[in-house]
Amino acid sequence: MQTRRETLKQSAVVAGLLASAGFPQFAHAAFNKAAFDAKGVQDAVKAAGGGAIAESKDVTITGPDIAENGAVVPLGASTSLPGVKQMLILVEKNPAALVAMFHVSDAVEANFSTRAKMGQSSDVYAVAIMADGKALYAKKEVKVTLGGCGG
């Protein structure tokens, strides 16, 4: 007869196998390789599904004026506009401009933050891609004193 301990151990093994079989497919499903491989801001926005970018006072980008360590630069993007499909954070002079892509639903407020690696001083963009494909942006210059990309 099987003991309770053996039953729990076998159940944990089965649950682990089932979980590991399904999750990797979902983790890779939302990755947009073309957008993250794009070299320029406009190319990344286009690959993410947006059109030509236009500046907007309704989109905000937050970050330091001077980043002492380019390896961990705190950046934020937000907007109160309705109908936002995606929010992007881009660093113009990084080898790959797109730093972060956030998918937005109607149930979520479009207010995101992350930390980025910056190799040099650059303009940083927050781009809101709307449901109709319009891409609205805000821009901020961040000066880096110590490079994060091998500097």
Each model region followed by its residue ranges:
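N-terminal secretory signal peptides and thylakoid transit peptides that target proteins
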Residues: 1-18
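Sec/Tat signal peptide C-region and signal peptidase I cleavage site
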Residues: 23-29
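Transition segment at domain starts
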Residues: 30-68, 100-102
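Short edge beta-strand/loop segments characteristic of extracellular beta-sandwich folds
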Residues: 62, 74-80
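An anionic, turn-rich surface loop/hairpin at beta-sheet edges
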Residues: 93-118
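Extracellular Ig-like/FN3 beta-sandwich strand-entry sites
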Residues: 119-123
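Short beta-strand edge segments in extracellular beta-sheet folds
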Residues: 141-147
